Amino acid sequence: DDLPDSIDWRENGAVVPVKNQGGCGSCWAFSTVAAVEGINQIVTGDLISLSEQQLVDCTTANHGCRGGWMNPAFQFIVNNGGINSEETYPYRGQDGICNSTVNAPVVSIDSYENVPSHNEQSLQKAVANQPVSVTMDAAGRDFQLYRSGIFTGSCNISANHALTVVGYGTENDKDFWIVKNSWGKNWGESGYIRAERNIENPDGKCGITRFASYPVKKGTN
């Protein structure tokens, strides 16, 4: 496949500033929203910060601040006819009752797709088109204390944290993923981690290839 050697969706205007999930286990909502914000900008040209809190409160297939997955959240957005802006359903960082009275979707998606797992080339192909939701093992000390550079620290592959891959590249012959986290701008490289890419394990760094998925958007909102 003829894929670009590198891509950074931040430079293409498809990524809103890094957010902070706080003490709520809502990483799945942030991962989902970042992917939807991305494809919406790519398709429509508009970059709109969208509502994680709506997903936390309203995605009944997930568990709010106690965890969840991206695919049921994508499916909620499909079924709901879209997702609210951050402005109209702001983040509170705690579980809440779904507020249907403020339901005013501004961005819709058509469906979602899973990236073929255990294959970094499949993930690269997807990320060449748009930001992609992924899981990583973020429980280890090395990950949590990451500051900068290409992350080569130790981690396993358990899917305990959700993030969004917003690009990839190579530095000094070392390939990396550009991954957006939701732990605020003071963590890592201004809220991002560059994780080593094209490693020998098909699960990818910290299991990044295991549960990757992305929203499909065909037209306007």
Curated annotation (Swiss-Prot):
Disulfide bonds join 24-65, 58-98, 155-206. The active site is at 27, 161. Its EC number is 3.4.22.67. Keywords: Disulfide bond, Glycoprotein, Hydrolase, Protease, Thiol protease. GO terms for molecular function: cysteine-type peptidase activity. It catalyses: Preferential cleavage of peptides with a proline residue at the P2 position. GO terms for biological process: proteolysis. It comes from the Eukaryota. Glycans are attached at residues 99, 156. PROSITE patterns: THIOL_PROTEASE_CYS, THIOL_PROTEASE_HIS. PANTHER family: CYSTEINE PROTEASE FAMILY C1-RELATED (PTHR12411). Cysteine proteinase with a specific activity toward peptides with a proline residue at the P2 position. This is Zingipain-2. It comes from Zingiber officinale.
